[in-house]
Curated annotation (Swiss-Prot):
The gene is nuoH. It comes from the Bacteria. The keyword Cell membrane applies. NDH-1 shuttles electrons from NADH, via FMN and iron-sulfur (Fe-S) centers, to quinones in the respiratory chain. The immediate electron acceptor for the enzyme in this species is believed to be ubiquinone. Couples the redox reaction to proton translocation (for every two electrons transferred, four hydrogen ions are translocated across the cytoplasmic membrane), and thus conserves the redox energy in a proton gradient. This subunit may bind ubiquinone. It comes from Paraburkholderia xenovorans (strain LB400). This is NADH-quinone oxidoreductase subunit H.
């Protein structure tokens, strides 16, 4: 019996019919706290990694090796005053950061951490993740409009156009995964990558979707970078043009919520990419299956997050017209072509997803 089963059975005996509600709230709270800690130390890892790429030390003053720097940053932001512009639409101005950060948390309801460990194992998990993650753009638009600033509004318009453009190619990539797996359930998609010729010979990593769906994997991940407005697609908050974009008139914790949502979305994109294309919690080799699945998922997510950071430190920022051209003239045609190719592949005798 697993630890979760033991807790569940003990809680049922202790609280009776109230236990399912209490257990759901406890799991949600634990996941939320873990996500917040991951965001805090992801920011530290980003600063450290970019520092090493720049041949400098990075933050190293607060705590041993700078490990307490995220806590110091949070305390600083908590003590900052939230200043509202005189001409801002007050309620919309305050609601906008919440509308950005809530969907980022909500996506985690359907992401499986290992077999049987998921908050909500619903059959339409993939559709839910795509739909909920698309809501955040409304908060960005409201933030730009409510600030009553031309720079904030320009950043919001850029964000809306960019996020809508790249959601199309991400949607195509998810449709192709759906075609091969035959299910919208994320646990089922991971399970569909655990069988086949290579998996039966212990080479699990060659049976994952990244190999047969490599163009879709590349398109999905790059589109994810654009969706999160990360470098080199960060024209929304281009420091050399419009400073912080839609966040320019925010301060204190209101400003921090936007950054919190950005880094949570980075982890979400990486977790979904690992689940859909890299086998989720599956071990890369059969003889390593004794290691808990959550360890493999965390390792894959950490690798993809490091690629996010590497891209920031390596590539120059794209012009806005180049970003739109990449999304509409390259990614969408590639997705349509590969969608047709995979369709014929599935219908042919060479179908590897049977």
């Amino acid at each position: 019996m697993s630890l979760f089963d033991t807790i569940n059975s003990g809680g049922t005996q202790l609280l009776g019919v109230a236990w399912p509600t209490v257990w759901a709230l406890v799991r949600i709270l634990v996941v939320a706290v873990v996500i917040l800690l991951c965001v805090a130390y992801l920011i530290l890892w980003e600063r450290k990694l970019i520092g090493w790429m720049h041949v400098r030390l990075g933050p190293n003053r607060v705590g041993p090796a700078g490990l307490l720097q995220p806590i110091a940053d949070v305390l600083k932001l908590l003590l900052k005053e939230v200043i509202q512009p005189a001409q801002a639409s007050r309620w919309i101005y305050m609601v906008a950061p919440i509308m950005v950060v809530v969907p980022a948390f909500a996506v985690w309801a359907v992401i499986p951490f290992q077999a049987g460990a998921v908050l909500g194992d619903i059959n339409a998990g993939l559709l839910y993740a795509m739909a909920v993650s698309s809501i955040g753009v409304y908060g960005v638009i409201l933030a730009g409009w409510a600030s009553n600033s031309k720079y904030a509004f320009l950043g919001a318009m850029r964000a809306a156009a960019q996020m809508v453009s790249y959601e199309i190619s991400m949607g195509f990539a998810l449709v192709v995964v759906l075609m091969t797996a035959g299910t919208l359930n994320l646990s089922g998609i991971v399970g569909s990558q655990e069988h086949g010729f290579f998996a039966s010979h212990g080479l699990n990593f060659l049976s994952w979707n990244w190999l047969p769906l490599l163009p879709m994997f590349v398109v999905y991940f790059i589109s994810g970078i654009a969706e999160t407005n990360r470098h080199p697609f960060d024209v929304v908050e281009g420091e050399s043009e419009i400073v912080a974009g839609h966040m320019i008139d925010y301060s204190g914790m209101a400003f921090a919520l936007f950054f919190l949502a950005e880094y949570i979305n980075m982890i979400v994109i990486s977790a979904l990419a690992a689940t859909l294309f890299l086998g989720g919690w599956s071990a890369p080799f059969g003889f390593l299956s004794f290691i808990p699945g959550i360890v493999w998922l965390v390792a894959k997510v950490f690798f993809l997050l490091s690629v996010f950071i590497w891209a920031r430190a390596t590539f120059p920022r794209y012009r806005y017209d180049q970003i739109m051209r990449l999304g509409w003239k390259i990614f969408i045609p590639v997705c349509v072509v590969w969608l047709v190719v995979v369709g014929f592949w599935i219908m042919s005798p060479l179908n590897i997803w049977k």
